[in-house]
């Protein structure tokens, strides 16, 4: 290895590979990180390349996948972009924005990615590993793979799986999802497609999402171990009722089952939705039911509507127009409706979207300037470079409190002075360009912010939900809701405890 002077051989890296996408790699890494932290180690998460529009911004303004940020929280450390040196952010038509060490470095098609970005990507992965070991000489890397490590048509350009495992001589776990069926074929097939030197890296197998009596798989466990000569380190029970699905706490496939919710929230499911982890704090409120809206419908059943962030704001605005959702959102606003936009959602609530540099999907439309929904008097102009930074501010509305979060967006948004509602529109934060709101004549409020993570601010969230309650003539709550960060810690601890009960990590460490 090229970094031996910074590497403590006692803390051999652990890598979690999967027999497929969605096998449980992300949650397994999250659990291992917390288990090792409790054992007194210094775990640090790492994923060489991730593809996601669910992102986080570190203290230096660097973008990284939210799943690696969550894993860093599990380690009890601050997220940093070298934990996820390559982030690919899909933006439609088989193209992605390429992020290296937190910074946007270009756009690539799937076809050209290997030719243009493979070698630069491998260099940035090695550089990031060196940075981590230089800063943390006693750490143990807990590495997440991506998809299957043996996609034979792609293996020569796979930056995330066996190339990293061999480079680090990592102790690898192979995770498989028994819920999907065919678990024996998944395990044997994956191992058979590996080269002998790759297969030697696999130190254990983990069966994930087992329903029912674990003792019923005793013979299956023995068969796998006899056939592969690799120990089955654990059989993890079905945890989906307790924990979020694969890919970083996303809510897109989750369903709420509250029989009598006090607050009903509708979130617009945009084609290019980004940062859906923004809604985890709402999902964790016992009184709130979330539903995703993907087609035009009467919205009056909802206490408030959220328009989320977007990777392609103009393209998603066109979707709202063509689907009829834009009209339904306007109708809802005239009927005591409450609407909240985040980032791209804020921009779409405005009057005008201008895209002179084709940054936000206007190449799908001959006109580079289109109308927004028009519920806030705001004009957004998209520029060549985007803004990524952490936010430390203070709110003015609906209460005064400290606010933390982060921005990831292209475009500058200003009040549209030609609009009659300008005087009725107020700032939400002391930093004026972070958000605006206005109260409807018909009742209800229209508001939006550039701050991702806004609902993680417990006091602000409590006051905003109470404001919604007032507009819907519901009782306001005097008690404070549980801290979202404490709730997240509880979720991670429970996850680690479940894994600890069913996973022989000491066998792996020894």
Swiss-Prot record:
UniProt pathway annotation: Cofactor biosynthesis; adenosylcobalamin biosynthesis
UniProt-annotated catalytic positions: 343, 452
A Pfam family the protein falls into: GATase_3
One annotated GO biological process: cobalamin biosynthetic process
Residues passing through the membrane, by range: none
SUPFAM superfamilies recorded: Class I glutamine amidotransferase-like, P-loop containing nucleoside triphosphate hydrolases
PROSITE patterns documented for this protein: GATASE_COBBQ
Keywords from the UniProt entry: Cobalamin biosynthesis, Glutamine amidotransferase
GATase cobBQ-type domain ranges (all copies): 262-460
Record carries keyword Ligase: no
Keyword Membrane carried by entry: no
Domain of life: Bacteria
Reported function: Catalyzes amidations at positions B, D, E, and G on adenosylcobyrinic A,C-diamide. NH(2) groups are provided by glutamine, and one molecule of ATP is hydrogenolyzed for each amidation.
Family to which this protein belongs: Belongs to the CobB/CobQ family. CobQ subfamily.
Name of this chain's protein: Cobyric acid synthase
Organism: Prochlorococcus marinus (strain MIT 9515)
């Amino acid at each position: 290895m090229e970094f031996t002077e910074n590497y403590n051989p006692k803390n051999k890296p652990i890598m979690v590979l999967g027999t497929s996408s969605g096998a449980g790699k992300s949650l397994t890494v999250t659990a291992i990180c917390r288990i090792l932290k409790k054992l007194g180690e210094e775990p640090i998460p790492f994923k060489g390349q991730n593809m996601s529009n669910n992102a986080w911004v570190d203290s230096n303004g660097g973008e990284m996948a939210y799943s690696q940020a969550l894993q860093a929280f599990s380690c009890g450390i601050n997220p940093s972009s070298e934990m996820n040196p390559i982030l690919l952010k899909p933006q439609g038509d088989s193209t992605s924005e390429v992020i290296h060490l937190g910074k946007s470095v270009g756009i690539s098609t799937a076809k050209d990615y290997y030719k243009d970005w493979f070698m630069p990507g491998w260099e940035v992965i090695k550089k990031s590993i060196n940075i981590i070991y230089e800063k943390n000489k006693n750490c143990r890397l807990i590495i997440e793979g991506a998809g299957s490590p043996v996609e034979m048509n792609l293996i020569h350009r796979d930056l995330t799986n066996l190339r990293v495992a061999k480079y680090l001589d990592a102790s690898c776990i192979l995770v498989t999802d028994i819920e999907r069926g065919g678990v024996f074929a998944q395990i044997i097939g994956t191992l058979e497609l590996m080269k002998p030197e790759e297969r030697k890296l696999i130190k254990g197998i983990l069966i994930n999402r087992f329903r029912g009596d674990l003792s019923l798989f005793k013979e299956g466990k023995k068969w796998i171990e006899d056939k592969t000569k690799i120990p089955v380190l654990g059989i993890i029970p079905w945890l989906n009722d307790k924990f979020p699905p694969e890919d970083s706490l996303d809510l897109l496939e989750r369903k709420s089952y509250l029989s009598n919710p006090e607050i009903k929230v509708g979130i617009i499911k945009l084609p290019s939705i980004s940062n859906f982890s923004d809604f985890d704090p709402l999902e964790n409120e016992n009184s709130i039911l979330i539903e995703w809206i993907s087609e035009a419908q009467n919205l009056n059943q909802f206490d408030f509507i959220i328009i989320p962030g977007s990777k392609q704001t103009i393209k998603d605005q066109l979707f709202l127009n063509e689907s009829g959702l834009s009209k339904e959102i306007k109708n809802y606003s005239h009927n005591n409706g409450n609407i909240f936009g985040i980032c791209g959602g804020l921009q779409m609530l405005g009057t005008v979207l201008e895209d002179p540099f084709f940054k936000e999907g206007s190449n799908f439309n001959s006109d580079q300037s289109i109308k927004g929904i028009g519920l806030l008097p705001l004009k957004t102009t998209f520029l060549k470079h985007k803004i990524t930074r952490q936010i430390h501010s203070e709110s003015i509305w609906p209460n005064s409190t400290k606010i933390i979060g982060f921005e990831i967006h292209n475009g500058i948004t200003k009040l549209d002075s030609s609009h009659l509602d300008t005087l009725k529109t107020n700032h939400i934060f002391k930093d004026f360009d972070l958000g605006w709101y206005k109260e409807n004549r018909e009742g209800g409020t229209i508001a939006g912010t550039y701050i991702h993570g806004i609902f993680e601010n417990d006091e602000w969230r409590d006051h905003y939900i109470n404001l919604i309650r007032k507009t819907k003539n519901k009782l306001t709550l005097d008690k404070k809701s549980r801290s979202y960060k404490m709730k997240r810690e509880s979720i991670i601890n429970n996850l680690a405890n479940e894994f600890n009960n069913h996973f022989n990590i000491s066998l792996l460490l020894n």
